[in-house]
Amino acid sequence: MASADELTFHEFEEATNLLADTPDAATTSRSDQLTPQGHVAVAVGSGGSYGAEDEVEEESDKAALLQEQQQQQQPGFWTFSYYQSFFDVDTSQVLDRIKGSLLPRPGHNFVRHHLRNRPDLYGPFWICATLAFVLAVTGNLTLVLAQRRDPSIHYSPQFHKVTVAGISIYCYAWLVPLALWGFLRWRKGVQERMGPYTFLETVCIYGYSLFVFIPMVVLWLIPVPWLQWLFGALALGLSAAGLVFTLWPVVREDTRLVATVLLSVVVLLHALLAMGCKLYFFQSLPPENVAPPPQITSLPSNIALSPTLPQSLAPS
């Protein structure tokens, strides 16, 4: 048991002196310290609200500065850095888009399932370059093989076919999508429900659709005319089907006449490209014009030839 002296009230001189020196100091009792767990009392002075507002303003200033820096770092369309982003694709993405162009299916949109709002120029650029090179090389090889079968055919390397193939393929892969994109933009003003693809998406559609022509051109080395036309028809059907299935969601909101005419023109231009490649790069050269050997005729031995005298010695 505690003694009576221990239970009596004691004054502490240090506390008394402290209160005398600082009469405005806040005091707390022991009951205030015994607060339930999980409850924290926070005392905010008169300047606390201003500190919170300063932090919010500082964060907003940082966000605005970061956005301004990003806008300044974004290159213009006339710079090389702007177009560099369109070549930033990996091999798996390019192969997936090539596979999508080779296996068109109804209801399977190439733009939505393979491009995913990220068109690239890497695939279309190299597909067009490869197709132009393969066209020129196989066209010359066809003439070499024809000369080996028929020596009367005269062959000389035709390097101009590389230029013709490059200009034809790149003009088709860029000018036709440009005209199609412009027409769809114009039809968007007539039919407000239509949402055309962007120009780069249209170029990407046409560029990947030309990939199927590369193996077709290689198979044209087989010197069988009907087999060459069969391979051409199969490649044209796959490529044109991919274009129709991709463009149909855009043009179906328009009138039936406009949609039918537009898709027919797209298929017709594709067919003209395939036929032009077949007829120009794989035409057979005519045989070399060789002069016939002179024919020597012998006269019978019983026919005597009369000698001829010069005109000056002939009798008058």
Swiss-Prot record:
<dbReference type="GO" id="GO:0005797">
    <property type="term" value="C:Golgi medial cisterna"/>
</dbReference>
<dbReference type="InterPro" id="IPR039765">
    <property type="entry name" value="Yip5/YIPF1/YIPF2"/>
</dbReference>
<feature type="modified residue" description="N-acetylalanine">
    <location>
        <position position="2"/>
    </location>
</feature>
<keyword id="KW-0007">Acetylation</keyword>
<keyword id="KW-1133">Transmembrane helix</keyword>
<feature type="transmembrane region" description="Helical">
    <location>
        <begin position="257"/>
        <end position="277"/>
    </location>
</feature>
<feature type="topological domain" description="Lumenal">
    <location>
        <begin position="278"/>
        <end position="316"/>
    </location>
</feature>
<dbReference type="GO" id="GO:0031267">
    <property type="term" value="F:small GTPase binding"/>
</dbReference>
<keyword id="KW-0472">Membrane</keyword>
<feature type="transmembrane region" description="Helical">
    <location>
        <begin position="197"/>
        <end position="219"/>
    </location>
</feature>
<feature type="transmembrane region" description="Helical">
    <location>
        <begin position="232"/>
        <end position="252"/>
    </location>
</feature>
<keyword id="KW-0967">Endosome</keyword>
<feature type="topological domain" description="Cytoplasmic">
    <location>
        <begin position="185"/>
        <end position="196"/>
    </location>
</feature>
<feature type="compositionally biased region" description="Polar residues">
    <location>
        <begin position="25"/>
        <end position="36"/>
    </location>
</feature>
<feature type="topological domain" description="Cytoplasmic">
    <location>
        <begin position="253"/>
        <end position="256"/>
    </location>
</feature>
<feature type="topological domain" description="Lumenal">
    <location>
        <begin position="220"/>
        <end position="231"/>
    </location>
</feature>
<dbReference type="GO" id="GO:0000138">
    <property type="term" value="C:Golgi trans cisterna"/>
</dbReference>
<dbReference type="GO" id="GO:0031902">
    <property type="term" value="C:late endosome membrane"/>
</dbReference>
<comment type="subunit">
    <text>Interacts with YIPF6; this interaction may stabilize YIPF2. May also form a ternary complex with YIPF1 and YIPF6.</text>
</comment>
<dbReference type="Pfam" id="PF04893">
    <property type="entry name" value="Yip1"/>
</dbReference>
<feature type="region of interest" description="Disordered">
    <location>
        <begin position="16"/>
        <end position="37"/>
    </location>
</feature>
<comment type="similarity">
    <text>Belongs to the YIP1 family.</text>
</comment>
<dbReference type="GO" id="GO:0016192">
    <property type="term" value="P:vesicle-mediated transport"/>
</dbReference>
<dbReference type="GO" id="GO:0005802">
    <property type="term" value="C:trans-Golgi network"/>
</dbReference>
<feature type="transmembrane region" description="Helical">
    <location>
        <begin position="164"/>
        <end position="184"/>
    </location>
</feature>
<dbReference type="GO" id="GO:0030133">
    <property type="term" value="C:transport vesicle"/>
</dbReference>
<feature type="transmembrane region" description="Helical">
    <location>
        <begin position="125"/>
        <end position="145"/>
    </location>
</feature>
<feature type="topological domain" description="Lumenal">
    <location>
        <begin position="146"/>
        <end position="163"/>
    </location>
</feature>
<protein>
    <recommendedName>
        <fullName>Protein YIPF2</fullName>
    </recommendedName>
</protein>
<feature type="topological domain" description="Cytoplasmic">
    <location>
        <begin position="2"/>
        <end position="124"/>
    </location>
</feature>
<dbReference type="InterPro" id="IPR006977">
    <property type="entry name" value="Yip1_dom"/>
</dbReference>
<keyword id="KW-0812">Transmembrane</keyword>
<keyword id="KW-0333">Golgi apparatus</keyword>
<dbReference type="GO" id="GO:0005794">
    <property type="term" value="C:Golgi apparatus"/>
</dbReference>
